[in-house]
């Protein structure tokens, strides 16, 4: 499976096909990647479908995919790696979007600790983390 082609096809679908067809494409491609044990592709596509479900306000599906993604990350022993932190940041953002503030906060802390061990202090990854973290505090109405 070619991830670049999969993502190009996915991107090309927006504006030309229905949201249902786009979701079906992601689900079917995730299933195929699992069948072929292409877990790097599975992780990428689970991140994509979490964002898709977040943007289309499909809470139950998003949370199910968040759980599945976290299980795969642990199964593959990716804890402490940057790609693990990136996926957790995506999950934390989904949790925040659906009002699971404490769960989101816990994941932001894990992402920060991972970044402290893996990236330079001035790395742009921190900007994304802290921007999303600040949105969490705003939504929690915690301004202190």
Regions found by a protein language model. Give the residues of each.
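Alpha-helical segment of the N-proximal tetratricopeptide repeat
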Residues: 4-24, 28-35, 51-59, 97
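Conserved alpha-helical positions within TPR/SEL1-like repeat arrays
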Residues: 8-15, 44-55, 82-97, 124-139
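Amphipathic alpha-helical segments of tetratricopeptide repeats
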Residues: 27-31, 70-75, 109-117
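Short coil/turn linkers that connect adjacent helices within long alpha-helical scaffolds
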Residues: 35-38, 75-79, 117-121
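Structural signature of tandem alpha-helical TPR/SEL1-like repeats
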Residues: 103-106, 110, 142-144
């Amino acid at each position: 499976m070619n991830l670049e082609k999969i993502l190009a096809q996915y991107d090309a679908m927006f504006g030309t096909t229905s949201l249902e067809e786009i979701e079906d494409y992601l689900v079917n491609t995730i299933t195929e990647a699992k069948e072929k044990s292409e877990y790097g592709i599975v992780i990428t596509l689970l991140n994509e479908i979490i964002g898709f479900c977040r943007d289309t306000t499909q809470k139950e599906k998003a949370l199910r995919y968040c759980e599945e993604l976290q299980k795969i990350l642990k199964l593959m022993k990716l804890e402490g790696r940057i790609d693990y932190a990136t996926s957790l940041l995506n999950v934390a953002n989904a949790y925040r979007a659906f009002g699971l503030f404490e769960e989101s906060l816990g994941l932001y802390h894990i992402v920060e600790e991972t970044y402290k061990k893996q990236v330079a202090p001035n790395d742009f990854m921190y900007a994304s983390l802290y921007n999303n973290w600040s949105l969490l505090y705003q939504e929690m109405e915690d301004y202190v």
